[in-house]
């Protein structure tokens, strides 16, 4: 596509502007100009020579030539301005370069916020720099004091470059506070030795991963460091911080929130929540295209979640969840926790596919306060269960739990206080009625004359 007739003087002005900023006498063809603009870095070679206007006054060029030049200008100045060809020479002459070694936060066009330390604006992660901010390494007294606070909702991931590592930065308070759309932080090992992490990740509700190949923990101030990080899962054992977790959990290994990218033990399943009220839990990331999708998201199979806020049916969607199906591929996981999965889903009345699950460990609060009237565990192997704490608590409409006649809980390594709290409608297959005196996990067994329980063999 062409832009129509273009005055050659416009091209000469653009080329002269490039030559002036670079201090060169180079002759540029129209298609070379965008690359030449992108290559400008504030260096003046001291050999500027302007070229006169051409005798040919006009010509026709593809639209893409000027689109590319405009993109290159925006890549240099970090603005979103739309440039007409006649505006481009002035825009090039107006370019200024942020030079000198300093810590910068660079917002890239893919939503990455890169922190690095170089003598000029440049990206290691890759992409086009949209905006640049100088980082005050002495720290910030609030989130709003950060130079990059205005772009916090545009950040999809953060990258901390190795050039930061040797600077001795100790105060990272509020750095990632309220990055509500950020799912991961990479290069966290380059912040080893920080001492102040106050509200560093507060209200990062979509944050799943903080990657680090190593980390030296010297944190002494960490108030509300992980407050609201309901989806953050450590890569070793699925550890999930609480809203009050201190900086001591900022570590690799058991009980740590960090993940070594070279030793990530986590696997993920997906919850596809459809407009008809059903959620399908599956190992398949792609939802059913023939159904209207309300929400979708992934859940860590080994995640030791500590409350609500990690499922697609959380917040405003929760009351709309009426049925759940576990797909056949949910049996493919080597380890699976269902902690808080349907907690307080008060309209959830139907759950199918429990027999498709395998290697289930913790079912802490899994069905708490649901509206189910019966559950079918036939085909479910209980031998790996470790935790049934409040699993069915508050299921006041639950009348029947079916299981295979061979059902047997592990003889050790399992707990589950108040597993059946307030399940006042529940009756076992041999007629054992729920009692407030028998709410422990031990009653999750087949009801017989010699071993009363709340399960019905089928």
Task: Place the predicted regions along the sequence by residue.
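Surface-exposed receptor/substrate recognition regions of extracellular proteins
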Residues: 1-100, 324
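Structural signature of tandem-repeat unit edges
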Residues: 110-112, 153-168, 180-195, 204-220, ...
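C-terminal capping region of solenoid repeat domains
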Residues: 252-261, 444-458
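N-terminal module-boundary/linker segments of secreted carbohydrate-active enzymes
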Residues: 7, 62, 99-111, 264-277
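Low-complexity, Pro/Thr/Ser/Gly/Ala-rich linker/spacer regions in secreted
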Residues: 42-46, 94-103, 259-268, 458
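Consensus positions within tandem repeat domains that build extended binding/scaffold surfaces
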Residues: 171-175, 196-202, 221-227, 337-341, ...
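LRR flanking "cap" motifs
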Residues: 116-168, 271-274, 278-333
């Amino acid at each position: 596509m062409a832009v129509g007739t273009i005055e050659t003087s416009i091209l000469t002005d653009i080329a002269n502007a490039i030559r002036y900023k670079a201090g060169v006498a180079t002759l540029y063809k129209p298609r070379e100009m965008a690359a030449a603009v992108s290559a400008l870095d504030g260096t003046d070679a001291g050999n500027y020579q302007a070229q006169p206007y051409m005798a040919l006054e006009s010509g026709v060029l593809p639209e893409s030539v000027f689109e590319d030049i405009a993109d290159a200008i925006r890549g240099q100045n970090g603005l979103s301005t739309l440039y007409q060809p006649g505006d481009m020479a002035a825009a090039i002459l107006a370019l200024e370069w942020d030079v000198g070694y300093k810590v910068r936060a660079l917002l890239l066009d893919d939503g990455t916020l890169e922190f690095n330390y170089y003598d000029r604006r440049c990206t290691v992660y890759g992409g086009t720099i949209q905006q640049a901010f100088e980082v005050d390494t002495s720290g910030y007294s609030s989130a709003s004091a950060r130079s990059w606070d205005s772009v916090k909702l545009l950040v999809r991931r953060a990258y901390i470059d190795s050039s930061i590592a040797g600077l001795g930065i100790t105060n990272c308070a509020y750095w990632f506070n309220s990055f509500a759309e950020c799912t991961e932080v990479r290069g966290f090992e380059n912040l080893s030795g920080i001492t102040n992490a106050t509200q560093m990740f507060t209200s990062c509700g979509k944050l799943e991963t903080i990657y680090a190949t190593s980390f030296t923990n010297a944190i002494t101030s960490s108030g509300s460091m992980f407050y609201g990080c309901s989806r953050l899962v450590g890569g070793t054992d699925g550890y999930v911080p609480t809203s009050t977790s201190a900086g001591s959990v900022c570590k690799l290994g058991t009980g740590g929130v960090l993940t070594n990218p070279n030793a990530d033990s986590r696997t993920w399943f997906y919850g596809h929540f459809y407009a008809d009220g059903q959620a399908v839990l599956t190992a398949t990331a792609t939802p059913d295209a023939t159904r209207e999708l309300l929400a979708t998201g992934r859940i860590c199979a080994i995640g030791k979640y500590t409350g609500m806020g990690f499922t697609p049916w959380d917040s405003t969607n929760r009351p709309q969840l009426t049925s759940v199906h576990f797909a056949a591929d949910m049996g493919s996981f080597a380890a699976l926790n269902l902690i808080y999965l349907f907690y307080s889903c008060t309209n959830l009345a139907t759950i199918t596919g429990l027999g498709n699950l395998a290697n289930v460990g913790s079912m802490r609060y899994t069905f708490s306060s649901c509206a189910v009237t019966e559950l079918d565990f036939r085909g479910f192997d209980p031998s790996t269960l470790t935790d049934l704490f409040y699993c069915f608590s508050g299921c006041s409409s639950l009348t029947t739990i079916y299981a295979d006649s061979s059902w047997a809980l592990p003889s050790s390594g399992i707990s589950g206080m108040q597993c059946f709290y307030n399940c006042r409608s529940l009756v076992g297959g041999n007629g054992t009625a729920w009692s407030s005196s028998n709410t422990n996990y031990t009653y999750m067994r087949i009801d017989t004359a010699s071993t009363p329980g709340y399960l019905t063999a089928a």
